[in-house]
Curated annotation (Swiss-Prot):
Protein name from the UniProt record: O-methyltransferase ZRP4
Domain of life: Eukaryota
EC top class, as a word: transferase
Keywords: Methyltransferase, S-adenosyl-L-methionine, Transferase
Disulfide pairings: none
Molecular function terms, GO-annotated: O-methyltransferase activity; protein dimerization activity; S-adenosylmethionine-dependent methyltransferase activity
Documented EC number(s): 2.1.1.-
Tissue-level expression: Accumulates preferentially in the roots and is located predominantly in the region of the endodermis, low levels are seen in the leaves, stems and other shoot organs.
InterPro entries: COMT-like, O_MeTrfase_dom, Plant_O-MeTrfase_dimerisation, SAM-dependent_MTases_sf, WH-like_DNA-bd_sf, WH_DNA-bd_sf
Gene: ZRP4
Assembly and binders: Homodimer.
SUPFAM superfamilies, per database record: S-adenosyl-L-methionine-dependent methyltransferases (SSF53335), Winged helix' DNA-binding domain (SSF46785)
Organism: Zea mays (Maize)
């Protein structure tokens, strides 16, 4: 029974509680997604042609017999959050027929784990790993106290994320695979949407490019461009060998190999203002003048750029707080402009074609 108009105050209280609950329990969306990834439910549905009943999913996933009834409840969360779709099985009423679960654009990104070029399973697995998630339980205390190190991750784990990747092979693989999966998707879109960014150059160095996913995508699309990756020695040691991409061990704070263009994909948001200026000054030393085609290509968020709907705005705001776990930050155009100016660059161009992220061309 609905509340009467005289009880509008009560309804307002219930509406407020609903909003509070929606945010409080939002972590269950992430945990449901993590479970779906662990069980490889998207693969199970894909193996049945993109639509599968619960019993068909059960035939493909490894599930303890006592958990069968709980899977239906998990799928209810995953369908209401649009990870999967649902439709009634033909031949019965909507009330008594077993639902058929279908793939959505979201769950298609979860097919194939690391075997699919555009699969985002490794990235989601990285972000939802306890090592990444646990520092945020300290976020409130972080705001109240001046800690010995401003990095929440280091405060929680005793060392920074890049130190941990160097010492923990399992975590290192998790991070490398996660970042590589994001690079494969976003650079693929960048090439299709703004191919002109990569035209007119004969060489490119991907600074902090990890195991080379972005550089390999660019090399494949533009075979005439000689691509290389600069990263720390322990990262380069695990890079693929059968590729046209050259891997160079080094430190971007010391020097960057010469090239027509430098790519910084999801790098600068890890660093504070002064460090960004240092990195970009080294980039400027590595590239020729603008007249000769020299430029820096940045793939990162520009807060306020791109689509203006609430989902995009919310994601930019959320990611800005997320990146605080390594003392990073997202920046608006004014903040980017100040960094470019201090690093000695003459001009820049923002190309907002990557959803919540943008391509920024920066010219010496």
């Amino acid at each position: 029974m609905e509340l009467s108009p005289n009880n509008s105050t009560d309804q307002s209280l219930l509406d407020a509680q609903l909003e509070l609950w929606h945010t409080t329990f939002a972590f269950m969306k992430s945990m449901a997604l993590k479970s779906a990834i662990h069980l490889r439910i998207a693969d199970a549905i894909h193996l049945h042609g993109g639509a599968a009943s619960l019993s068909q999913i059960l035939s493909k996933v490894h599930l303890h017999p006592s958990r069968v009834s709980s899977l239906r409840r998990l799928m209810r969360v995953l369908t209401t959050t649009n990870v999967f779709g649902t439709q009634p099985l033909g031949g019965g009423s909507d009330d008594d027929s077993e639902p058929v679960y279908t793939l959505t654009p979201v769950s298609r990104l979860l097919i194939g784990s690391q075997s699919s070029q555009l699969a985002q399973t490794p990235l989601a697995a990285m972000v939802l790993d306890p090592t990444i998630v646990s520092p945020f339980s300290e976020l409130g205390a972080w705001f109240q106290h001046e800690l010995p190190d401003p990095c929440i991750f280091k405060h929680t784990h005793g060392r920074g994320i890049w130190e941990l990747t160097k010492d923990d092979a399992t975590f290192d693989a998790l991070v490398n695979d996660g970042l590589a999966s994001d690079s494969q998707l976003i650079v693929d879109v960048a090439i299709k949407q703004s191919a002109e960014v990569f035209q007119g150059i004969s060489s490119l160095v991907d600074v902090g490019g990890g195991i080379g996913a972005a550089a390999q995508a660019i090399s494949k699309a533009f075979p005439h461009v000689k691509c290389s990756v600069l990263d720390l020695a322990h990262v380069v040691a695990k890079a693929p060998t059968h590729t046209d991409v050259q891997f160079i061990a080094g430190d971007m704070f010391e020097s960057i190999p010469p090239a027509d263009a430098v790519l910084l994909k999801s790098v600068l948001h890890d660093w504070d203002h002064d460090d960004c200026v240092k990195i970009l000054k080294n980039c400027k030393k590595a590239i020729p003048p603008r007249e000769a085609g020299g430029k820096v290509i940045i793939i990162n968020m520009v807060v306020g750029a791109g689509p203006s709907d609430m989902k995009h705005k919310e994601m930019q705001a959320i990611f800005d707080v997320y990146i605080m776990f390594i003392n990073g930050m997202e920046r608006d155009e004014q903040e980017w402009s100040k960094i470019f100016s201090e690093a000695g660059y003459s001009d820049y161009r923002i190309i907002p074609v990557l959803g919540v992220r943008s391509i920024i061309e920066v010219y010496p």
